[in-house]
Swiss-Prot record:
InterPro entries recorded: DBL_dom_sf (IPR035899), DH_dom (IPR000219), PH-like_dom_sf (IPR011993), PH_domain (IPR001849), PKHG5/7 (IPR040181), Ubiquitin-like_domsf (IPR029071)
Lineage: Eukaryota, Metazoa, Chordata, Craniata, Vertebrata
In-chain residues carrying the UniProt-annotated modification Phosphothreonine: T729
Organism: Homo sapiens
Protein name as catalogued: Pleckstrin homology domain-containing family G member 5
Pfam families per UniProt: RhoGEF
Main location: cytoplasm
């Protein structure tokens, strides 16, 4: 019975078990012609005992069930070829999430047709379809393949089909590059197809398909096969019966959304990338584009110009035996030494080639692709860091050190000498400075590369092509990026291998110096990386601290004024320690704090190197806010309490008085003990940091470059000393480099706190040595002097750079006459006194001004010029000892008493010849001073103050070199010993002023 107005379905007989129990999704696609619906209805009416009404009801029930199943006829579309060549019709599966081009590509390759040379039309439409549309929307439709409308193209297609070799025509890509996603389609035809298929114009040519819309859009299952052969001619009738039943699906096909266009652009970029990479494979790797300079440096031009020359320089013989004549006569140890040296040269050349592969294959290709508009989102510097700088430094190292060693061996046919490498490895710290940046950024480069490989299809295709290149030697990009730090850590191993096989003492010293230079640089790199990690950890902790709320404001005005100071900078340097030291997080955890008798709260504490933070967690967030002022670790007294799991923190101020007490309760006794021990360890660690860099004398670590410069100057001056010894000149007259000093107060002459003068007095006594009891327990044993010595000993400068002092060398200690004490650095600036010793007052110095923290870089002090020393030198005496000598109270064999203040000496020792009141003009010529020399008296001061006879003094004056006539000494007045000498008015005035100031200050202190 025929029912008009009902939707017609191709249903199996009602009695079929398959139709009742098996879903059509599990059945294979039907390729046989469909059975006429009227015959099925008649059979069903007979099986239903003639009850047509019940049959109709059954049909309506089946109709409801069929709405939720897939129609097998919508799983495929029919492809007909309207060409002059007879080609069999194909039934192609309409796959979901596949473009039309991707589905048709295997069919066209099998039939030998180039997909880009034909046009695809939908049923009776005259508008070519775009190959980027999704294929599943064409299910149940006819697609016709026609020759393009352009004149002359049809003949080309037919000629390609008739040619026996036409099977290779559609594969336009070279062999080995892999099939692309789909062939390039003419851009103009694609643009026209998009314009024709616009929503405003599609009804003009497709009106017959926009009729009934009774069946909603259904998604066909994805078949397993790529294409199905045509079964019989009945499939054409089946396709005709589908025509008007998929209007909704067909209308959805024309809605070209942004996803479709984005997919098309991605396909275009992939095709363009494959074409570029194929060009690089055929015609060679490109040069770095002139418009794109990596890191804005000029290394690329030099690199391009000298590449051929470098290739020639990097060519090595197969073995070191080809360089040396008579290698058969060498001992076994010499052969092993040559093997070790050759390994150093060979691995260096191989490493330079690896760096060149990274630059030429990966970096230059990437920059050329970016110039073409591909992979522009990739940051080359973030991916490769400063590898070009590393390649450049190794080229310089090879050209200046390695290549000359090889050329010398080739020219002389002699052994490879390890000492020839000393020139380059001695400057290892300054030459290899780019490695510091690369090692610190290497982890970030690796992470960035992994992210690109995971998310960027174009980058993944580019890296896959590059890693398959013959130059890469099957290495991954990650392996190539790890080469620099591996090479850096391999240098000490190679040099130690050379050292073990070397017997000559001079060569051993050179290799040891090279190993020391390399290891110092590696330690410096490790320290930089460790500090960087600590800064990152500290930054992570800082990000968790939300606010600083330790002060409660009483009004809005107070709140506004406080707002400027309510902050805490945990990244600031540790007070009293070196600026290079980074604050570390030692312990963190939750505690229960009790402040007072009743106040209890849950807190979260952070223990750093120098402070303890008490914070409170913010609700619904992993952040905290500071609720108590930071507690300095060195002012905390920690004690455990009898209550299990409790400990007390007493906070002291600068006067060592308690200003706060906090009781903390941990969750267990072990955790409580851990907090107490960690606080003690933090206090010890902070004390060590401040002991290494005491306040007021903080000296940053020397840079490697300055250290190497200092070593060079030291060697040059050693050579000058050797030359001076050969010519009979005393070694004491050659300049010696003292250790470097910063702008800190201890490295310079200590400034007095007033406009006072500092006398530099030298008193010479024969027989005194540096280890005299007065030096050990006298005025030189003050605490400030010990600090100066410890600072000198703990300096980073090598001990060989300190001024060597012999057993008879004297020292001149500067003393602040205003206080009668030695300056803190008086023992660091020892200069041997000249033969013309006299009282030399220093210029008045301005009061101290608080100086800013010392800069991280050290400044080199001007080399101290040493004067020739007399044969018998003695250490300096204090002013008190000098006055005793002036009073005639000492013989040159008796050690002087400990120093006393000048005021005490003036009261205890009567000196009738010295006046402390009145002006020098009033004193006149009768103002004498025992043992005080006249200006320019020269060694007479030494002899007279030590009680030496005047005759011996005259004898020594006769030993002066020619051309230096001694000054004529005035005859002493009658009745005065020859040991007495007169002082000039200026000298007497200075002594008087100094004595007055010292007496005044001493009296004020009492």
């Amino acid at each position: 019975m025929h029912y008009d107005g009902h939707v017609r379905f191709d249903l199996p007989p009602q009695g079929s078990v398959l139709a009742r129990n098996v879903s059509t999704r599990s059945c294979p696609p039907r390729t046989s012609p469909a059975v006429d619906l009227e015959e099925e209805e008649e059979e069903s009416s007979v099986d239903g005992k003639g009850d047509r009404k019940s049959t109709g009801l059954k049909l309506s029930k089946k109709k409801a069930r069929r709405r939720h199943t897939d129609d097998p006829s919508k799983e495929c579309f029919t492809l007909k070829f309207d060409l002059n060549v007879d080609i069999e019709t194909e039934i192609v599966p309409a796959m979901k999430k596949k473009s039309l081009g991707e589905v048709l590509l295997p069919v066209f390759e099998r039939k030998g047709i180039a997909l880009g040379k034909v046009d695809i039309y939908l049923d009776q439409s005259n508008t070519p379809l775009s190959l980027t549309f999704e294929a599943y929307r064409f299910g149940g439709h006819y697609l016709r393949v026609k020759a393009p409308a352009k004149p002359g193209d049809e003949g080309k297609v037919e000629q390609g089909m008739k040619d026996s070799k036409s099977l290779s025509l559609p594969i336009l890509r070279p062999a080995g590059t892999g099939p692309p996603a789909l062939e390039r389609v003419d851009a103009q035809s694609r643009r026209e197809s998009l314009d024709i298929l616009a929503p405003g114009r599609r009804r003009k040519n497709m009106s017959e398909f926009l009729g009934e819309a009774s069946i909603p859009g259904q998604e066909p299952p994805t078949p397993s096969s790529c294409s199905l052969p045509s079964g019989s001619s009945g499939s054409t009738n089946t396709g005709d019966s589908w025509k008007n039943r998929a209007a909704s699906r067909f209308s959805g096909f024309f809605s070209s959304g942004p996803s479709t266009s984005a997919f098309g652009r991605e396909v275009d970029k992939m095709e363009q990338l494959e074409g570029k990479l194929h060009t690089y494979s055929l015609f060679g790797l490109p040069r770095l584009p002139r418009g794109l300079r990596f890191d804005h440096d000029s290394w690329e031009e030099e690199y391009d110009e000298d590449e051929d020359e470098d290739n020639a320089c990097l060519r090595l013989e197969d073995s070191w035996r080809e360089l040396i004549d008579g290698h058969e006569k060498l001992t076994r140890r010499q052969c092993h030494q040559q093997e070790a040296v050759w390994e150093l040269l060979h691995t260096e050349a191989s490493y330079i080639r690896k760096l060149r592969v990274i630059i030429n294959l990966f970096l230059c290709c990437l920059l050329n692709l970016q110039e073409s508009g591909l992979l522009c989102e990739v940051e080359a510097e973030r991916l490769f860091s400063n590898i070009p700088e590393i390649a450049q430094l190794h080229r310089r190292l090879w050209a200046s050190v390695m290549a000359p060693v090889l050329e010398k061996a080739r020219r002389t046919r002699a052994l490879l000498q390890p000492g020839d490498f000393l020139k380059g490895f001695k400057m290892f710290g300054s030459l290899f400075k780019p490695y510091i940046r690369y090692c610190m950024e290497e982890e970030g480069c690796m992470e960035y590369m992994r992210g690109l490989l995971r998310d960027n299809d174009l980058f993944r295709a580019y890296i896959t092509w590059a890693e398959k290149h013959p130059q890469c030697q099957r290495l991954k990009l990650s392996d190539m990026l790890a080469k620099p730090h591996q090479r850096l850590t391999k240098y000490p191993l190679l040099l130690k291998s050379v050292l073990r096989k070397t017997e000559e003492p001079r060569a051993k010293e050179a290799v040891v110096a090279m190993i020391g230079s390399v290891e110092r640089f590696i330690h410096h790199v490790n320290a930089c990386m460790r500090q960087r990690q600590e800064r990152q950890r500290l930054a992570a902790v800082v990000s968790r601290i939300d606010a600083y709320e330790v002060v409660e404001s009483s009004s809005d005005e107070v709140d506004k004024l406080l707002k400027e100071f309510l902050h805490l900078d945990l990244t600031a340097p540790i007070p009293g320690a070196s600026p290079e030291e980074t604050r570390q997080l030692l312990l963190e955890g939750s505690l229960r704090m009790k402040e007072g008798k009743d106040s209890k709260m849950d807190v979260y504490c952070f223990l750093f190197t120098d402070l303890l933070l008490v914070t409170k967690a913010v609700k619904k967030a992993e952040r905290t806010r500071v609720i108590r002022p930071p507690l300095l670790v060195d002012k905390i007294v920690c004690r455990e309490l009898r209550d299990p799991g409790s400990f007390l923190l007493i906070y002291l101020n600068e006067f060592h008085s308690a200003v706060g007490a906090y009781t903390f309760q941990a969750s267990g006794q072990a955790l409580c003990r851990g907090w107490v021990d960690t606080i003690y360890n933090a206090q010890n660690q902070l004390q060590q940091l401040r002991a290494q860099e005491p306040p007021g004398s903080q000296q940053p670590l020397q840079s490697l470059e300055e250290e190497e410069d200092e070593q060079e100057e030291e060697e040059e001056e050693e050579e000058e000393e050797e030359e001076g010894e050969d010519s009979g000149t005393s070694a004491a007259s050659s300049p010696t480099i003292m250790r470097k000093s910063s702008g800190s107060p201890d490295s310079q002459h200590c400034a007095s706190d007033g406009s006072t003068e500092t006398l530099a007095m030298v008193v010479v006594e024969p027989g005194d040595t540096l280890s005299s009891p007065e030096f050990d327990s006298g005025p030189f044993s003050s605490q400030s002097d010990e600090t100066s010595l410890s600072t000198t000993a703990s300096s980073a400068t090598p001990t060989s750079e300190l001024l060597p002092l012999g057993p008879v060398d004297g020292r001149s200690c500067s003393m602040d006459s205003a206080y009668g004490t030695l300056s803190p650095t008086s023992l660091q600036d020892f200069v041997a006194p000249g033969p013309m010793a006299e009282l030399v007052p220093r210029a008045p110095e301005s009061p101290r001004v608080p100086s800013p923290p010392p800069s991280p870089r050290l400044r080199r002090r001007t080399p101290v010029q040493l004067l020739s020393c007399p044969p018998h030198l003695l250490k300096s005496k204090s002013e008190a000892s000098l006055l005793q000598l002036l009073a005639g109270a000492g013989t040159h064999g008796t050690p002087s008493a400990p120093s006393r203040s000048l005021s005490e000496l003036c009261l205890a020792v009567p000196a009738p010849g010295i006046r402390t009141q009145g002006s020098p003009q009033e004193a006149g010529p009768s103002w004498d001073c025992r043992g005080a020399p006249s200006p320019g008296s020269g060694p007479g001061l030494v002899g007279c103050l030590a009680g030496e006879p005047a005759g011996s003094h005259r004898k020594r004056c006769g030993d002066l070199p020619s051309g230096a006539s001694p000054r004529v000494q005035p005859e002493p007045p009658p009745g005065v010993s020859a040991q007495h000498r007169k002082l000039t008015l200026a000298q007497l005035y200075r002594i008087r002023t100094t004595l007055l100031l010292n007496s005044t200050l001493t009296a004020s202190e009492v």
